[in-house]
């Protein structure tokens, strides 16, 4: 029998068929509102359940608001819970009706049952109606003094809710001071934890416009408070323990004894069953001992066992999180984990994401003593049914080979992969063989003899085909059929969709031409003609360049395209050391899982106010080389600032440099003179103009004859700065937008300082020793940007500084904004003096 049509189907009994059913509910609730008959509470429960059910599936039942409130006059806690849930959901959208709930909620806040008092207080604070905040102050004050810890816990959270609704009401009622007192004296651990969480959030938000809040926030990091929490840490639940440990990370110990005392207090937390607590403890240990090399290494030894235990005992998801943190530690100290490499062997039932991470860790811990065992294990994975893991295992073998561990055996293993006759194995192996030949040219005979037997028709992946073409061009003299294979590939130019492959074809044809000209001349002509007509800009430009350089001089073209082979000693890492250090600073966060700093995967508006300068995300600066742009304006054009808004950037666009000349776009005529200008430079040789400012670049460090004298030191500073100055990032951002630019200046940075920039946090620590504090930093070579702030010792006067250092020119662009314009020049002198000493012994 066919089902009835949609229009003839009966409505589900769990869903209202229309407004009539909601009206029926309203009528039934009104009838039960004043009834005291036996079983009335059961009837109310059934009706409440229907209302809540409709509400959860998105049906508007706000019309029964009044009836729900009238039926709440009962001692049944289940009814009250459902009523509170309903009221909290509809109160914000019905502020007028919310007034009806105030009386019964305030009455319930005084109930004899602490559970009802707590539930009522939580519901009262969840109304989120600004007009009703005056009714929250009294119940919250009573709740904070309640004898029952559950009510106090709810009241503390309610204070934070009140602050978000009306900050002034919360501050005027002196609730933060009450929370601080509770935090330091309450006997219940959950109340203390809630107080800490609420105060951190309130004071962080208040610090942007209140110096008192800044001081209060700093007081959380005082030694008595930190030790108070650490001594009681066993009383707290896992969430609260993580909160306390995160606070302890920011504490600056006074001496080494302080460090050892904290580690002794937290020693047993490393054995905790909760992985979050263990990772938070590990972060404390690592951060405390960063300046103590020997102890830091011992910490690695100590934390190794707990982390490996968590990896083997948890779910795949937990194992992955722990492994991600272990991977970070393994990369920083591989020798400590070298003996434990078997812990990173893949299990057959593990998810692919766990296996992939373990393969990376096996690559990191490989050394002379364990390479054979690790490579043997990796070769087994190459036959894995999971193609992604098979590819990763082959790449891992290649990475180990590039580390110069047991190269002979590894090359033999890689060449054996080519005999497996699996497309993806062959493709990955060809890419690795190419890299091996770049580093170990002496293996060319063995590799080429095997690679020469591979048909290019069987290679479909662009990277693998590009690697094969590179070998055909680089070793054309050793491969008898190289010109003919290249000719066949060039004839199918139109069928090749990868620009990378077409670029390699052009270069390989050129190289083969210089080694076997008669056999390659026709193919080269075809390739150049096809390349010049190619729609891809890079392919077109390279073909045109090759054509013109061949027209100019064949011998010059050979020196340019096919110079003598030089072995590559080191391959570029995928991540800079600065990125890795930033991820390490964000240990026990998503940054470790994603293997990138938080500023790379969070939106600007969601980053929030960071509490300390070393936690403010990097400021991305695009290092575009434009010789026509004066330095100060170049950085403005490339700025992707985290701290400055659009208005501030627009304001600065018209600011001229210290010579008084604003940026002007280069004319088209200037580009036509580039060649002649380069010729003039080539003829003039090393001679320099007497008026040209001396450049202190990296060449000075390598003894190339340039002067290494430091920049002249400015006159001694006359301004005294506050060594303990504090300024919240939010306040810095607000001031930076409001204050005008007081001074813009350029100064030189000595070569030692340029070299010292490679050490993470080096400039930040140096300037801090001169009472100038960093609030944000970032960039990538050659441009690095820093934002500093300082305060006068005698009065709260702020100096905000933007400093952009270009390592190529060894120049620093300084922009200062000050509360007191009269002392701006004096501060600039102090700043330049400190900067001139950077990197000096």
Curated annotation (Swiss-Prot):
Positions of the UniProt region annotated as Disordered: 1-25, 650-671
Top-rank taxon: Eukaryota
Keywords: Cytoplasmic vesicle, Golgi apparatus, Membrane, Protein transport, Transport
Similarity comment: family membership: Belongs to the adaptor complexes large subunit family.
Record-level Gene Ontology MF annotations: clathrin binding; protein histidine kinase binding
Function: Subunit of clathrin-associated adaptor protein complex that plays a role in protein sorting in the late-Golgi/trans-Golgi network (TGN) and/or endosomes. The AP complexes mediate both the recruitment of clathrin to membranes and the recognition of sorting signals within the cytosolic tails of transmembrane cargo molecules.
Subcellular location: Golgi apparatus; Golgi apparatus, trans-Golgi network; Cytoplasmic vesicle, Clathrin-coated vesicle membrane
Xref: SUPFAM superfamilies: ARM repeat
Gene3D superfamilies according to UniProt: Leucine-rich Repeat Variant, TATA-Binding Protein
Quaternary structure and partners: Adaptor protein complexes are heterotetramers composed of two large adaptins (beta-type subunit and alpha-type or delta-type or epsilon-type or gamma-type subunit), a medium adaptin (mu-type subunit) and a small adaptin (sigma-type subunit). Interacts with AHK2.
GO annotations of cellular component type: clathrin adaptor complex; clathrin-coated vesicle membrane; Golgi apparatus
A Pfam family per the record: Adaptin_N
Principal location class: Golgi
Biological process annotations from GO: intracellular protein transport; vesicle-mediated transport
Tagged with keyword Cytoplasm: no
Organism: Arabidopsis thaliana (Mouse-ear cress)
Name of the protein this chain belongs to: Beta-adaptin-like protein A
Membrane topology field: Peripheral membrane protein
Composition bias type Polar residues, residue spans: 9-25, 654-671
């Amino acid at each position: 029998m066919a089902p009835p049509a949609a229009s003839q189907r009966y409505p589900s009994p769990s869903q209202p068929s229309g407004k009539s059913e909601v009206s029926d509910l309203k009528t039934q609730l009104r009838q039960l509102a004043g009834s005291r008959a036996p079983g009335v509470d059961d009837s109310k429960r059934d009706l409440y359940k229907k209302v809540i059910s409709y509400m959860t599936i998105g049906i508007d039942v706000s019309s029964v608001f009044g009836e729900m409130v009238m039926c709440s006059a009962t001692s049944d806690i289940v009814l009250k819970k459902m009523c509170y849930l309903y009221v909290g959901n509809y109160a914000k959208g019905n502020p007028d009706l919310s007034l009806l709930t105030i009386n019964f909620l305030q009455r319930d806040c005084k109930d004899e049952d602490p559970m009802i008092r707590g539930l009522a207080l939580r519901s009262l604070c969840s109304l989120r109606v600004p007009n009703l905040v005056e009714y929250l102050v009294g119940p919250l004050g009573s709740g904070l003094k309640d004898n029952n810890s559950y009510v106090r816990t709810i009241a503390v959270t309610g204070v934070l809710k009140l602050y978000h609704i009306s900050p002034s009401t919360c501050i005027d009622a002196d609730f933060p001071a009450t929370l601080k007192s509770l935090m330091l004296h309450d006997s219940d651990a959950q109340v203390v934890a809630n107080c800490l969480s609420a105060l951190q959030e309130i004071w962080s938000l208040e610090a942007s416009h209140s110096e008192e809040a800044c001081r209060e926030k700093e007081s959380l990091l005082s030694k008595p408070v930190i030790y108070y929490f650490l001594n009681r840490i066993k009383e707290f639940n896992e969430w609260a323990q993580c909160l306390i440990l995160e606070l302890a990370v920011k504490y600056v110990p006074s001496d080494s004894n302080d460090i050892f005392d904290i580690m002794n207090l937290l020693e047993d937390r490393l054995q905790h069953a909760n992985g979050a607590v263990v990772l938070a403890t590990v972060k404390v240990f690592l951060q405390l001992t960063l300046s103590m090399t020997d102890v830091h290494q011992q910490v690695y030894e100590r934390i190794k066992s707990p982390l490996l235990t968590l990896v083997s005992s948890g779910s795949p998801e937990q194992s992955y999180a722990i492994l991600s943190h272990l991977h970070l530690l393994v990369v920083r100290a591989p020798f400590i984990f070298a003996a434990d490499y078997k812990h990173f062997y893949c299990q057959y039932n593990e998810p692919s994401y766990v296996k992939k991470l373990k393969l990376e860790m096996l690559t990191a811990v490989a050394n002379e003593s364990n390479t054979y065992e690790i490579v043997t294990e990796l070769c087994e994975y190459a036959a894995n049914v999971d193609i992604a893991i098979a590819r990763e295992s082959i790449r891992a073998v290649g990475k180990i080979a590039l580390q110069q561990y047991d190269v002979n055996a590894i090359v033999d293993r890689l060449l054996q992969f080519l005999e497996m006759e699996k497309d993806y194995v062959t493709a990955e192996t060809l890419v690795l063989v190419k890299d091996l030949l770049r580093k170990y040219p002496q293996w060319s005979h063995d590799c080429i003899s095997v690679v020469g037997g591979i048909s290019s028709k069987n290679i479909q992946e662009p990277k693998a085909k590009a690697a094969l073409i590179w070998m055909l061009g680089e070793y054309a003299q050793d491969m008898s059929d190289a010109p003919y294979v290249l000719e066949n590939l060039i004839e199918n130019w139109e069928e090749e969709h990868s620009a990378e492959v077409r670029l390699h074809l052009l270069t390989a044809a050129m190289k083969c031409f210089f080694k076997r000209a008669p056999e390659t001349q026709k193919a080269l002509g075809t390739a150049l003609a096809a390349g010049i007509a190619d729609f891809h800009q890079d392919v077109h430009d390279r073909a045109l360049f090759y054509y013109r350089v061949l027209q100019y001089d064949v011998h010059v073209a050979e020196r340019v395209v096919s110079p003598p082979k030089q072995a590559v000693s080191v391959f570029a890492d995928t991540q800079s050391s600065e990125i890795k250090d930033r991820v390490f600073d964000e240990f026990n966060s998503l940054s470790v899982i994603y293997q990138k700093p938080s500023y790379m995967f969070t939106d600007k508006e969601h980053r929030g106010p960071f509490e300390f300068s070393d936690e403010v995300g990097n400021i991305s600066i695009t290092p575009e080389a434009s010789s026509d742009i004066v330095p100060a304006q170049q950085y403005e054009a490339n700025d992707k600032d985290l701290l400055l808004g659009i208005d501030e950037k627009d304001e600065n666009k018209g600011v001229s440099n210290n010579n008084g000349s604003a940026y002007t776009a280069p004319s088209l005529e200037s580009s036509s003179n580039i060649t002649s200008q380069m010729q003039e430079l080539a003829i003039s040789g090393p001679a320099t103009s007497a008026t040209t400012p001396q450049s202190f670049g990296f060449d000075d460090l390598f003894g190339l004859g340039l002067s290494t004298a430091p920049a002249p030191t400015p006159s001694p500073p006359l301004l005294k700065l506050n060594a303990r100055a504090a300024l919240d990032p939010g306040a810095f951002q607000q001031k930076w937008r409001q204050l005008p630019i007081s001074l813009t200046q350029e100064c030189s940075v000595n070569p030692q300082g340029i070299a010292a920039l490679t050490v993470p946090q080096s400039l930040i620590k140096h300037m801090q020793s001169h009472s100038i504090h960093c609030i944000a930093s970032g960039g990538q070579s050659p441009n690095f940007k820093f934002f500093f702030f300082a305060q006068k010792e005698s009065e709260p006067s702020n100096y905000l500084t933007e400093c952009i250092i270009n390592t190529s020119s060894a120049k620093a662009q300084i922009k200062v904004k000050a509360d007191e314009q009269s002392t701006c020049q004096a501060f600039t002198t102090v700043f330049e003096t400190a900067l001139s000493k950077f990197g000096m012994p």
